[in-house]
Amino acid sequence: MRNIIVEPLNQTPIEDQKVEIVERKGIGHPDSISDGIAESVSRALCNAYLDRFGAIMHHNTDEVQITAGESAPQFGGGEVIKPIEILLTGRGIAEVDGEKIGLDRIAISAAKEYLRDNIINLDVETCTVVECKIGHGSGDLRDVFARKGRAPLSNDTSFGVGFAPFSETERIVMEAENLLNSPEFKKKYPAVGEDIKVMGLRENDNITLTVACAMVDRYVSDLEEYLEIKNVVKDEVFKLASGITERNLEVFVNTADRCEDDEPSVYITVTGTSAEMGDDGSVGRGNRANGLITPNRPMSMEATSGKNPINHVGKIYNLLSNQMAADIVESIEGVKQVHIMILSQIGKPIDHPKAATAQVILEDGYTMDDITGKVSGVMDAWLEDIPSITEMLVKGQLRTF
């Protein structure tokens, strides 16, 4: 019997609160690059372990540090003067029953592949230096297969949190960044780089969006063209947001620009990321497991990217909580808003947490008796199927930032 608790949440629903703040750091932000590299290295190791040994061995690659380079962007195309330095750290199994695996090679290759796929104007070979300092350990397959068919044991006493549904402001912030960094948008407007941050502020029924968007200098001939692209970004974000909300909208783009000065200062880059010129990055310093930073909502400070997907509850429970919450809202009539909290106890099976709690705000006309059993059922089913979280992570089907 799992310890599942369902209780009413005595709180003003998010859409009725007077002030709401939401942030998303796009995939080209240095903190998000660190998250993306960490997770891609973990996923590459998982698949290498499965191919070689038939099981995922212990590892954590959630310590990626980006030290910014130096660049000289200019209209028409500038240059990277000093490369971006990327340090991969953490720990991983490099030898199993006397058989070695190329851990460093796999990690560096995964990091570079991630950069090529996601920061498309970055010359990975000449503009980055990737160094691997992941600690090496050894493993025993007998220990791994001894637990086959049983839930892994929690690596820590930790908790995960999630919520659903997204508010209008949360949807707008998430979808605006996704739009600007979509392949279709990049093909149409190649000057728009990947380093995009969207900050949303809702004051009652007025939503203000502030977008920071790195432009790629080689695709921008002069200040006039730069301003044209800024207007495109503004108009496209406004159009997207208007399809989500009927609230009043205002969109600002690159508000630090100084276009009227004798020597204009604008946000142009050589590569599309500010990591090229002074902005460092670290894992876990940006988006939470659901892709947003939401001070109005419950959040965990745990970084999810790069942690092992087998028994690291700081990763698994945060992702599981969000899956649970979304499922509850979508499948159970009468649930207006739900917060999920799951607490582990070190050394105990991860499918039997110390506590799994759902805090629920109901739609008008419903009682807790109407939904408690159904909510418990959804949570119990997800805990029973917790290996599916691991499977989705290994296949790259779950967002971790």
UniProtKB/Swiss-Prot annotation:
<dbReference type="Pfam" id="PF01941">
    <property type="entry name" value="AdoMet_Synthase"/>
</dbReference>
<dbReference type="GO" id="GO:0006556">
    <property type="term" value="P:S-adenosylmethionine biosynthetic process"/>
</dbReference>
<comment type="similarity">
    <text>Belongs to the AdoMet synthase 2 family.</text>
</comment>
<dbReference type="GO" id="GO:0000287">
    <property type="term" value="F:magnesium ion binding"/>
</dbReference>
<keyword id="KW-0554">One-carbon metabolism</keyword>
<keyword id="KW-0808">Transferase</keyword>
<dbReference type="InterPro" id="IPR027790">
    <property type="entry name" value="AdoMet_synthase_2_family"/>
</dbReference>
<dbReference type="GO" id="GO:0006730">
    <property type="term" value="P:one-carbon metabolic process"/>
</dbReference>
<dbReference type="GO" id="GO:0004478">
    <property type="term" value="F:methionine adenosyltransferase activity"/>
</dbReference>
<protein>
    <recommendedName>
        <fullName>S-adenosylmethionine synthase</fullName>
        <ecNumber>2.5.1.6</ecNumber>
    </recommendedName>
</protein>
<dbReference type="InterPro" id="IPR002795">
    <property type="entry name" value="S-AdoMet_synthetase_arc"/>
</dbReference>
<comment type="pathway">
    <text>Amino-acid biosynthesis; S-adenosyl-L-methionine biosynthesis; S-adenosyl-L-methionine from L-methionine: step 1/1.</text>
</comment>
<keyword id="KW-0547">Nucleotide-binding</keyword>
<dbReference type="InterPro" id="IPR042544">
    <property type="entry name" value="AdoMet_synthase_3"/>
</dbReference>
<dbReference type="GO" id="GO:0005524">
    <property type="term" value="F:ATP binding"/>
</dbReference>
<keyword id="KW-0460">Magnesium</keyword>
<feature type="binding site">
    <location>
        <begin position="135"/>
        <end position="140"/>
    </location>
    <ligand>
        <name>ATP</name>
    </ligand>
</feature>
<keyword id="KW-0067">ATP-binding</keyword>
<comment type="function">
    <text>Catalyzes the formation of S-adenosylmethionine from methionine and ATP.</text>
</comment>
